[in-house]
């Protein structure tokens, strides 16, 4: 699927078509990453999708999660599950293997770690970097996003990975953390 493919006399770009499809399903950001160097991945390609959190909900989170945030968290997880499941069906319908990492499929160990975290896929797919708050930070939405991922063997054109934090001297998340739990370390 790299580059343009001639189909019926019309040049097609399968990677762009897939990305456009994921956006049509509700993803605000879509990144495609090379996972061949990631030991915990059984698939060579990872697709990360993100949906921003509404600003008014973030403003209300200053001291503790609110009921509205919890409801939104659940709603956005359901929406992300639907988006990556649709992507899985799109790719398997074209003869590729695909695995949507939905909330009901991901397993975690006793330390609450998953074999292939969404944020690992997201950095490999160029969506952003891991900030001093240990969250994915995107240029478009900061860390106010929910993310999910989809794994595949489809030969999609990968985006450039983000390999360094862009936080620099910024300490805003450390300064504003109400629990003072952040230690100002870069990933």
Task: Describe the residue ranges of each PLM region.
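Catalytic cores of enzyme domains
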Residues: 38-41, 69, 75-187
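Non-catalytic, usually N-terminal nucleic-acid engagement modules in DNA/RNA processing proteins
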Residues: 8-82
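Short hydrophobic alpha-helical segments enriched in small aliphatic residues
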Residues: 3-5
């Amino acid at each position: 699927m790299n580059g343009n493919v001639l189909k019926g006399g019309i040049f097609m770009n399968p990677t762009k078509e897939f990305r456009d499809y994921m956006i049509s399903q509700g993803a605000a950001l879509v990144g495609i990453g090379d996972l061949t160097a990631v030991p915990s991945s059984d698939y060579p390609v990872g697709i990360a999708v993100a949906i921003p959190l509404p600003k008014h909900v973030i403003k209300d989170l200053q001291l503790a999660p609110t009921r509205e945030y919890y409801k939104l968290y659940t709603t956005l997880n359901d929406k992300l599950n639907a988006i990556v499941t649709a992507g899985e069906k799109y790719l398997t319908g074209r003869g590729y293997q695909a695995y949507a990492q939905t909330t009901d499929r991901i397993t975690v160990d006793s330390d609450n770690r998953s074999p292939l975290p969404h944020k690992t896929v997201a950095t490999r797919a160029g969506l952003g970097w891991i900030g001093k708050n240990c969250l994915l930070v995107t240029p478009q939405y900061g860390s106010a996003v929910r993310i999910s991922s989809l794994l595949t063997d489809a030969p999609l054109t990968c985006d450039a990975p983000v390999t360094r934090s862009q936080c620099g001297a910024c300490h805003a998340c450390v300064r504003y953390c109400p629990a003072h739990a952040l230690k100002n370390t870069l990933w």
